[in-house]
């Protein structure tokens, strides 16, 4: 276990920043809600992937990679998938059409989030692989009296849950049943005992995918969205460590961290807690619940109707048009992906984020400067990160990525390549290919002496501070004649004047 300051994380459940103490330091466990694979992931979907990848890296650094399990699910059973399959493959058998939609969409998602610099989670369970666990949990909930069968559906009753000892329904959202009912889009159905009851299982219509049903229901059916995550987290984070439905030890039926976007607090995460806590008789499903904030695009809510709906693939294909065409398309995707990652990490994960083309371009410029220094000094990635103290300290304070990036800027300014490179690695911003390879277009436009250019830029900044504009302009013009274009700006952290440069022509 590496030394680190006490990790403190904001817990949505308690609305407090809490010291993180894993249930078992040898088996730290985290679950994050993943994609429903029916369409390309949009740029808002990228945010939780990046946020919890940084947390995954931090936990691995502190507790050891072999002691951390990160599960991110794949939802491959959903009405939206069915609709997309019917639209895109009308001539195929329905199950084959669904398979094509889910396989191709998942493959695209994996490629896109990898380009953003993310590690693969430890496990990525698919809903279709865990029907047995879902049926078993539903049977348990019916037996306990918090779920019931009606017209071949199985429904969970929040009011029945609140009549039992244990956690209250609504504790995560901090709302009463009446408040949740008033603010929710509730499916009205005659077979419900109460409007707030939600579906655990529903019958499949003819031609739709279906599986053997729980609770003695004779017709084929499929699960509701919420039970899928309860079952998959049980399968990957409880059962392998001695927990599950056969275990009556409450501590073995909890895990450490559950994450996702703020939009999932209600109803999805509220319903997960209800199902899991009732099934296992626990006070908590996960000890800490973390949620990232919303994303806007150029100051507006992202929406297809506004014409500002941007997928991750759109960003990778078109986000930095000034890069031109690269022979190595995969490397180009990764370069833009790292710029997108840096852009997102400049906003604290719990705050709303404003995605802009300008910030993406500025992040790419900053990466260019950082990698330029690492390339000049022949930085090599060590097996163990030992010079990441300031970055770890920042991230240990509720993933304060802005302060962590400020530490990287400080290391760059001091020409501390070890602190810069290792800190970039911990944040997922370091791709060794861009340090070592000779044929990277953004670095291979011309052979230039980086140190000499930086020295002349420093001299120019001195002239600017002295208000000697003629000499400052002379250096700028000389560099441009040599194929080096300067771009003036301000350090986002300090407000100091900065100058970046690029090789042109």
From Swiss-Prot:
It is an enzyme of class 6 (ligase). It holds the Pfam family tRNA-synt_1e. A motif ('HIGH' region) lies at residues 35-45. Its EC number is 6.1.1.16. It catalyses: tRNA(Cys) + L-cysteine + ATP = L-cysteinyl-tRNA(Cys) + AMP + diphosphate. InterPro entries: Cys-tRNA-ligase, Cys-tRNA/MSH_ligase, Rossmann-like_a/b/a_fold, tRNA-synt_1_cat_dom, tRNAsynth_Ia_anticodon-bd. ATP binds at residue 304. A motif ('KMSKS' region) lies at residues 301-305. It comes from the Bacteria. GO terms for cellular component: cytosol. This is Cysteine--tRNA ligase. It comes from Brucella anthropi (strain ATCC 49188 / DSM 6882 / CCUG 24695 / JCM 21032 / LMG 3331 / NBRC 15819 / NCTC 12168 / Alc 37) (Ochrobactrum anthropi). The gene is cysS.
